[in-house]
Amino acid sequence: MKFIYSIFIIIQIIFFINLINGQIVRGPDLQLGYVENGTMLLGSPNVVNIGDQNFMNTKDLSNSSWTDHRYNRYDWSFIRFHIRNNQSGFEATADFHPRVDEFSTIKFSANGLIQYLNETNKNRNVFKNREVEGYTVWAEIPYSKNVTSFTSRLVDVPCQETLTNGSVVVSTDKACQNVTDITTATYQKVENYNSTVLEPIILPPKHIFEFSTRTFVSYFTIIFQLDNGAIVDAVWDGDRDTSICKNCDSCIDNQCATKFDDMRCDEGVGCQLKFFLAWAGVDKSGKNCVSLNKIPSKFQKYSATAIKNMGTGLVSDFFYKINDNNNNPNTA
């Protein structure tokens, strides 16, 4: 009996140690990604302005280094974030190196904006309201994707055709009736065709604030798509599944938003604009990606927390509690 009791105590100790070092208590560690905190402050005058030059515009997409590179799980990749204010003209970038198939979290400080939104005098400055609402975010990944365009055109077709078996077929089209020489007559028909070209992977801009509904997108989720280790696409989760917004206070460009007044932020820390990164598909070694199961829209299925309130900045929010890693290129 004492032996069984001892085994039970040992199992409890092991469970407790794993829990303390696990995601729920300490937050995701290296195996679940790394938070890049404080890289950029929204509205900060000290961030380099890159103008309207997109990163991928400088890359030769025919170069195989941008199209043929393949990743295994835990390899370092690259993504560049852009934040722009369409009213003030402020623009900045931040680079991040997420590890393949890790659920990664990136935070940008938005304290000043959130404090402004929570001012008691809600309409003190119309231009300031528009300036805050003018913030947009987008992202670039230094790889290309195949984009197929479907279109149609009018083509001339002979009214009379000779088939391979020697038989002659005459079209019943109106243009082929009452013609002088059926052998030279033609009619027009619509021909559908498609063409495939390489285009850079650029996620479209999304707004962060909306004053008409007094809502704010507190987090964005990006899904990377792997095909045998090659990054072939990336998409905003809200664009991937538009039903996500049905349980939110509002939808801003298909992204789930919550009301300003409902934002619960850590005292002295404020709210952070967050980007969650996850992976789908198969890596270079043929392993299926599993980090997709950790995104908020998936997690919502097993949580009592409303999806609109996930990641609002609470101390207990395990999305943030990340351990430092000296070998992480994001800290270099």
Curated annotation (Swiss-Prot):
A Gene Ontology term for the protein's cellular component: extracellular region
Disruption phenotype: No effect on growth rate, asexual development, sexual cell fusion, or zygote formation.
Chief place of localization: secreted
Cleaved signal peptide residues: 1-22
Keywords: Glycoprotein, Secreted, Signal
Compartments where located: Secreted
Glycosylation sites: N37, N63, N86, N118, N146, N165, N178, N194
Domain of life per record: Eukaryota
GO biological process terms, semicolon-separated: sexual reproduction
Protein name: Uncharacterized protein DDB_G0273449/DDB_G0273577
Top-level taxonomy: Eukaryota, Amoebozoa, Evosea, Eumycetozoa, Dictyostelia
